[in-house]
């Protein structure tokens, strides 16, 4: 607590955006509300005349509005009354659903968006970016053009092709319960077999054991047939997952096991906190020079 507030005088932002309150850094903040209040320090420190960009769909939207010191708010999401939203359905296509199309609605008009990112949470992130762009005067067509030029951040739901032609969804950059759920939502939409390579989720404090048990349950609910886990905490996930779950003490052994089983009808999600260095697993499974198909 207080870290965001301490930085605000240095930056003096005219736009403040919090994408969501996620189950991360619970070890330091104690609860989800603690996380949300720490993130809300951004809104509390905005100057008069600045714009607060608020996720209207988030559980803590009302808290952030109460904390907002700016004179202007631009909301985004699917909630009724949101300033920046979507009309109609989201249509996914491309390898592992890596292209999403939708109609963007802003106070200035509408535009068709072709977003080259997987995951419904990335549509929500795109709405946040659109709301910020609207706040600085960019029209709907300009926003749509910018969103269409986006590319995945390395290790954030990057779709690649592994040995044997399997799809690999590289989400190895970091992990917490919220981002794992988002990754599993993407995996659940894939055809064929769905596998999960899971590393520890760090900085969860007293919630760590239950969070990893819930990870095993969530994987099963997402239709995952095989769970390959590594890390001190992921044994809880394997125990909860049951049949098809395997725990490894060594990354090389995990890679050898996964590589020996992969086939073209498999999609595998790779997810874990930075401490696991799961990018090494990705590098071992993806042939050099191959990123997608």
Annotate the PLM regions:
Residues 1, 22-24, 57-59, 174-175, ...:
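Short glycine-rich anion-binding loops that position phosphate/pyrophosphate groups of nucleotides
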Residues 4, 168-174:
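Switch II (G3) loop of P-loop NTPases
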Residues 8, 14-167, 192, 217-226, ...:
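Acidic, Mg2+-coordinating active-site environments of NTP-dependent enzymes
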Residues 9, 255-263:
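Short amphipathic alpha-helix with an adjacent loop that forms part of the alpha/beta core around
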Residues 15, 128, 262-271, 277:
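Short SAM/SAH-binding signature in class I
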Residues 153-155, 172-247, 273, 290-293:
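Active-site beta-alpha connecting loops in nucleotide-dependent enzymes
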Residues 163, 200, 237, 252-255, ...:
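Nucleotide and nucleotide-moiety/phosphate-recognizing core
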Residues 245-257:
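Short acidic-hydrophobic, aromatic-tinged amphipathic segments that line or gate anion-handling sites
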């Amino acid at each position: 607590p207080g870290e965001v507030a301490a930085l605000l005088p240095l930056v003096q932002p005219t736009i403040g955006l919090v994408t969501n309150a996620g189950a991360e850094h619970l070890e330091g903040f104690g609860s989800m509300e603690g996380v949300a209040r720490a993130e809300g320090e951004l809104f509390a420190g905005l100057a008069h005349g600045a714009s607060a960009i608020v996720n209207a769909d988030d559980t803590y939207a009302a808290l952030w509005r109460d904390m907002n010191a700016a004179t202007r708010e631009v909301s985004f999401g699917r909630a009724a009354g949101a300033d920046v939203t979507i009309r109609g359905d989201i249509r996914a296509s491309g390898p592992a659903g890596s292209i999403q199309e939708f109609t963007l609605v802003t106070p200035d008009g509408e535009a068709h968006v072709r977003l080259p990112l997987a995951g419904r949470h990335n549509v929500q992130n795109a709405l946040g970016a659109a709301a910020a762009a609207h706040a600085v005067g960019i029209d709907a067509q300009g926003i749509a053009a910018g969103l269409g030029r986006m590319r995945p951040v390395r290790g954030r739901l990057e779709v690649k092709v592994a040995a044997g032609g399997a799809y690999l969804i590289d989400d190895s950059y970091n992990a917490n319960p919220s981002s794992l759920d988002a990754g599993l939502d993407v995996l659940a939409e894939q055809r064929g077999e769905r596998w999960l390579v899971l590393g520890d989720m760090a900085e969860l404090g007293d919630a760590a054991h239950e969070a990893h048990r819930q990870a095993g349950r969530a994987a099963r609910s997402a239709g995952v047939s095989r769970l390959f886990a590594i890390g001190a905490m992921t044994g809880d996930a394997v125990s909860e997952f049951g049949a098809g779950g395997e725990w490894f003490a060594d990354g090389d052994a995990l890679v050898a096991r996964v590589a020996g089983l992969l086939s073209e009808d498999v999609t595998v999600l790779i997810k874990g906190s930075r401490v696991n260095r799961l990018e090494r697993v990705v590098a071992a499974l993806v042939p050099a020079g191959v990123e997608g198909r």
